[in-house]
């Protein structure tokens, strides 16, 4: 890579936030390492940061930087080697009729309404069910990298044609896709929208000829994050190197075995 292309990454500064309450593990405090300034984090730089374990929330690019905890483990699916298990095949068959539309990050009132409904039923009391439109847009619709919004609706000719079922945000990297966030209709019983969304993203990553789908952080002791271990083969970032999930050891693999609630990106 030329020096000109390396310049934005070398010009970045990193700082640690003050401790705050962890949103994944009760009773723990968390810190983040934040990459700045945001205007230097273009698609190329962001791809490299993701490979180093960073994520983004809006234009805020960060990775866990906790004092006494290393539970958040970056993970990615090797899409060329992925084979769905039986429950994943059922989820695909149940929802493959949905019509997907890929679009730029754009505010749609219907999306915002579904987001609030999803938060109120899946994460009641967490505060995000009270997000204003500005907070929603800052969280999901602001990006300085190559980002897309995907909406899933019931197809024409179906009993509820056009009904919005799910919305997903993804980033396009130079070596894969990164799943940013997903919310869906929480009212339909027996749906597997979260699982279907990841399967759809795996297929899209493969169709683009890219090797990895980044799923954010796997956390063994968090039921809403441990589901990611169900998508194999999975790699995890430890010690600045990507390793097979199985290399974490038997205890870590067993911790992810129980089937948790539907996924959160």
UniProtKB/Swiss-Prot annotation:
GO molecular function, one term: arginyl-tRNA--protein transferase activity
Group of enzyme by EC: transferase
Keyword entries, A-Z: Acyltransferase, Cytoplasm, Transferase
Cystine crosslinks: none
Localization annotation: Cytoplasm
Annotated EC: 2.3.2.29
Principal location listed in the UniProt entry: cytoplasm
Swiss-Prot/TrEMBL catalytic activity: N-terminal L-glutamyl-[protein] + L-leucyl-tRNA(Leu) = N-terminal L-leucyl-L-glutamyl-[protein] + tRNA(Leu) + H(+); N-terminal L-aspartyl-[protein] + L-leucyl-tRNA(Leu) = N-terminal L-leucyl-L-aspartyl-[protein] + tRNA(Leu) + H(+)
Pfam families referenced in this protein's UniProt entry, alphabetically: ATE_C, ATE_N
A Gene Ontology term for the protein's cellular component: cytoplasm
Alphabetical GO biological process terms: ubiquitin-dependent protein catabolic process via the N-end rule pathway
Family that this chain belongs to: Belongs to the R-transferase family. Bpt subfamily.
PANTHER family cross-referenced by the UniProt entry: ARGININE-TRNA-PROTEIN TRANSFERASE 1 (PTHR21367), ARGINYL-TRNA--PROTEIN TRANSFERASE 1 (PTHR21367:SF1)
Purpose of the protein: Functions in the N-end rule pathway of protein degradation where it conjugates Leu from its aminoacyl-tRNA to the N-termini of proteins containing an N-terminal aspartate or glutamate.
Protein name, UniProt field: Aspartate/glutamate leucyltransferase
Origin species: Cupriavidus taiwanensis (strain DSM 17343 / BCRC 17206 / CCUG 44338 / CIP 107171 / LMG 19424 / R1) (Ralstonia taiwanensis (strain LMG 19424))
Species classification: Bacteria, Pseudomonadati, Pseudomonadota, Betaproteobacteria, Burkholderiales
The gene coding this protein: bpt
């Amino acid at each position: 890579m030329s020096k000109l292309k390396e310049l934005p990454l070398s010009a970045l500064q990193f700082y640690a936030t003050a401790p705050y309450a962890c949103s994944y593990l009760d009773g723990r405090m968390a810190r983040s390492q934040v990459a700045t300034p945001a205007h230097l984090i273009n698609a190329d730089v962001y791809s490299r940061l993701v490979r180093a374990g960073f994520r983004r929330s809006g234009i805020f690019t960060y990775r866990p930087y906790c004092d006494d905890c290393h539970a958040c483990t970056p993970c990615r699916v090797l899409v060329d080697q992925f084979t769905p298990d039986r429950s994943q095949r059922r989820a695909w068959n149940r929802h493959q009729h949905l019509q997907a539309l890929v679009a730029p990050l754009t505010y749609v009132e219907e999306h915002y309404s579904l987001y609030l409904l999803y938060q109120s039923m899946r994460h009641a009391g967490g505060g995000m069910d009270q997000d204003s439109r500005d907070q929603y847009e800052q969280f999901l619709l602001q990006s300085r990298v190559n980002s897309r919004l995907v909406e899933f609706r019931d197809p024409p000719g179906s009993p509820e044609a056009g009904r919005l079922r799910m919305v997903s945000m993804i980033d396009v990297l130079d070596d894969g896709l990164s799943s940013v966030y997903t919310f869906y209709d929480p009212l339909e019983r027996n749906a597997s929208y979260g699982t279907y969304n990841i399967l759809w993203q795996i297929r899209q990553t493969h169709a683009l000829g890219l090797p990895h789908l980044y799923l954010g952080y796997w956390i063994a002791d968090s039921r809403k994050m441990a589901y990611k271990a169900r998508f194999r083969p999975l790699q995890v970032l430890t010690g600045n190197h990507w390793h097979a999930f199985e290399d974490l050891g038997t205890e870590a693999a067993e911790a992810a075995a129980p089937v948790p609630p539907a996924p959160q990106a």
